[in-house]
Design a protein with these regions (language model features):
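A sensor for short, sequence-defined functional sites
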Residues: 1-382
Length: 382
């Protein structure tokens, strides 16, 4: 027999699959979710309590002035919270980031929230280790071109909004739908077989075009420049059962390798993606810093050096950094092994909320990450 948590997650993850496939909220209104989901839990004999809260986009619950801003949630005995699934949902086990670390109120009544009694509390806040973006870059120099294969792996709230951006409805339904007897997009449509298959074919054609454009934009945003060519794009894990969402892209860039006499310069810092740059008046701040959630960025860069070239020691030394403070961490380590340059990088946002008095801690790390983004190495001709 499944536990209460397993039964609730089984029910909820079907709703998540539906929302991701159709790119919309499962219910048009939160109050409808607060009615429907409990009815299903009751049939499954899963105990629950009703909760209200607000998102980070609205006022705190204690300051609420418009009940339309209240969000209905359902809580299990173990404290797990469920909200109306939407395009940003990733799993029943991961609370939507907009509802984390927020003032909330639970009612002990399972029938009607207003019956009470009531209890104030704060919703769960995730940790930086829960929300990880991990990239692995393998690059090969070909004269003035750089051939890049990059794998992105996302966990926790880092998956929000990404799944329906890069995975087709067919991929989502096949990966998420197996426990429900769903084998493709046509199976979740309330159509007869022939009409469902036609609708699935039409959706597949639309997804192919849209997702191709999304990957083009992703690569352009990553390097702040369009690639010369895109060789392949592939989603290798769709994030079902709270597993990581993973995709791989292979493409060719110019402008990152340049000749300098007999030597070459490689803009290796560009291989970690664009970094935040704070300048001018933006460096002066009077309010606390509120991030979406704590998170960690991890990058592993492998560059195959062209035959007859090596990395100068001075260039290599500049790629090593170790900064750590109360609120953020930025560490890089570079080494050459054989004919390959290896770089390991980690940037951690330790907290969601940082007092303005510690704004300098944030600037210190962001400045160093931006500096690294602009680092070049000299490849000296032997």
């Amino acid at each position: 027999m499944k536990s209460d948590e397993e039964k609730a997650n089984f029910i909820y993850d079907y709703m998540v699959m539906w929302s991701l496939a159709f790119k919309k909220e499962y219910m048009n209104y939160d109050i409808q979710f607060g009615t429907l989901f409990p009815q299903v839990l009751k049939k499954a004999k899963v105990p629950f309590t009703r909760v209200i809260s607000t998102t980070w986009s609205d006022e705190a619950l204690s300051n609420i002035i418009n009940f339309d801003n209240a969000v209905s949630l359902i809580e299990l005995k173990n404290g797990q919270l469920f909200s109306n699934p939407n395009v940003y949902s990733v799993s029943g086990k991961v609370l939507y980031s907009q509802l984390q670390n927020r003032e909330a109120q639970r009612s002990k009544s399972s029938n009607n929230f207003s019956e009470g009694p009531f209890e104030d509390f704060k919703t769960l806040a995730s940790k930086s280790s829960d929300n990880v973006e991990k990239i692995e870059v393998n690059a090969t120099i070909d004269d003035a071109l750089l051939h890049i294969t990059r794998t992105e792996t996302l966990t926790g709230n880092e998956k929000e909004g990404v799944i329906p951006t890069y995975a087709t409805a067919e991929e989502i339904c096949k990966a998420w739908g197996e426990p429900y007897g769903v084998h493709g997009y046509a199976d979740i449509l309330s159509y007869k077989k022939s009409k469902g298959e036609a609708a699935a074919k039409e959706r597949a054609e639309a997804d192919k075009k849209e997702i191709s454009e999304n990957f083009q934009e992703e690569i352009k945003n990553y390097h702040d420049k369009a690639p010369v060519s895109i060789e392949s794009t592939e989603v290798t894990s769709v994030g079902q059962n709270n597993t990581p969402f993973t995709y791989k892209v292979a493409y060719t860039m110019d402008g990152l390798v340049k000749k300098a006499g007999k030597n070459l310069t490689l803009s290796v810092g560009q291989l970690i993606g664009q970094q935040t740059h704070i300048e001018g008046k933006e460096r002066q701040r009077t309010d606390d810093i509120i991030f979406s959630y704590p998170r960690t960025f991890v990058a592993t860069i492998n560059v195959e050096l062209p035959s007859g070239y090596n990395v100068t020691p001075e260039s290599l030394q500049k790629l090593n950094t170790n900064l750590d403070n109360e609120d953020m961490r930025f560490v890089t380590k570079a080494e050459v092994m054989g004919n390959k340059l290896f770089i390991h990088l980690e940037k951690e946002y330790k907290k969601q909320i940082v007092p303005v008095a510690r704004w300098q801690n944030i600037l210190e790390i962001l400045d160093r990450a931006y500096d690294f983004n602009n680092q070049q190495v000299i490849l000296r001709k032997k």
